[in-house]
């Protein structure tokens, strides 16, 4: 595996697509029907994951570049990559079938929705597991904290993607999924706590990985990636969306309908922060010195 910005983009697209599908699945089960929002996530979800998977295959120097090597990777069930491709493929297939049924019949079997949502959660967690599998070489990629962090971030970015599109295509249904206002306050806090836990845990790493661990944390907090970390991730990606969601929770619904620009800005901030989280985690990681 070659760790580049393309991997960061895959991690972002896969997580966002999975989160979008889950939100739309929940919207489809809401007391008040949200068929437009459900349609948005059921189409955007598998498309994002499919594009991300293509990037993963290409960046792994397989697929179009080396199909035989790719088939070897997939057939090796002892590798994290193989199980990841299986999970990704299953999700894309199930989600695509769900989307087609939704387009044709305007409704979908609840069992199929639930299967798709479970697979979506697995996809979101796998984006962290993929990096965590290399934690021996890259101590920043903690095998336990990172999957949870990416899962929470997937929910944030997936919800944000659906809401941004919904403001143009399903504005009348947004009020029916009011829980997204609460999630807009809770998820950034959870993300921040998990980032603190990740950096704190990595910073106290001992043994031969200690130097690489401390250098990785410093890279983010005070080093070459500090500006992007503090401005684009912390301020734009977490603090601004949290404040915007808090403000939204204190406004009346009528007032909210008149401020779509502020709401959309908050969701775009979430998307920027979601990509920057993955980009920074990938690019700022310092490998353990060999020998």
Q: Residues of each region from the PLM?
A:
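Long, contiguous internal "core" modules enriched in hydrophobic/ aromatic residues
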Residues: 4-5, 11-13, 31-33, 39, ...
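Selective recognition of specific alpha-helical transmembrane segments in multi-pass small-molecule
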Residues: 46-54, 188-198, 277, 281
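Membrane helical hairpin/interfacial module
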Residues: 16-94
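Hydrophobic alpha-helical transmembrane segments
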Residues: 259-265
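Short, strongly hydrophobic alpha-helical membrane anchors
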Residues: 1-5, 290-291
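Juxtamembrane boundary at the C-terminal end of a transmembrane helix
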Residues: 275-291
């Amino acid at each position: 595996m070659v760790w580049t910005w393309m991997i960061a983009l895959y991690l972002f697209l896969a997580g966002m697509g999975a989160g979008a599908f889950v939100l739309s699945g929940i919207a489809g089960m809401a007391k008040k029907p949200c068929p437009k929002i459900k349609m948005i996530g059921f189409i955007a979800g598998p498309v994002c994951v499919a594009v991300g998977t293509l990037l993963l295959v290409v960046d792994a120097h397989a697929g179009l570049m080396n199909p035989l090597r790719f088939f070897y990777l997939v057939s090796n069930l002892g590798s994290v990559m193989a199980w990841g491709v299986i999970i990704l493929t299953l999700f894309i297939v199930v989600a695509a079938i769900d989307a087609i049924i939704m387009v044709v019949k305007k409704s979908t079997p609840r069992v199929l929705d639930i299967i798709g949502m479970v697979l979506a959660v697995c996809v979101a967690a796998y984006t962290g597991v993929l990096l965590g599998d290399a934690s021996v070489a890259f101590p920043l990629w903690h095998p336990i904290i990172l999957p949870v962090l990416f899962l929470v971030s997937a929910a944030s970015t997936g919800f944000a993607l659906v809401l941004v599109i919904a403001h143009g295509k399903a504005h009348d249904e947004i009020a029916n999924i009011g829980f997204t206002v609460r999630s807009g306050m809770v998820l950034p806090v959870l993300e921040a706590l998990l980032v603190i836990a990740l950096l704190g845990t990595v910073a106290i790493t001992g043994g031969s990985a200690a130097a690489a661990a401390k250098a990785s944390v410093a890279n983010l907090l005070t080093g070459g990636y500090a500006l992007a970390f503090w401005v684009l991730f912390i301020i734009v990606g977490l603090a601004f969306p949290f404040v915007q969601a808090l403000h939204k929770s204190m406004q009346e619904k009528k007032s909210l309908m008149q401020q779509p620009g502020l709401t959309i800005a908050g969701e775009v901030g979430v998307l920027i922060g979601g990509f920057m989280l993955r980009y920074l985690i990938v690019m700022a990681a310092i490998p353990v010195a060999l020998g």
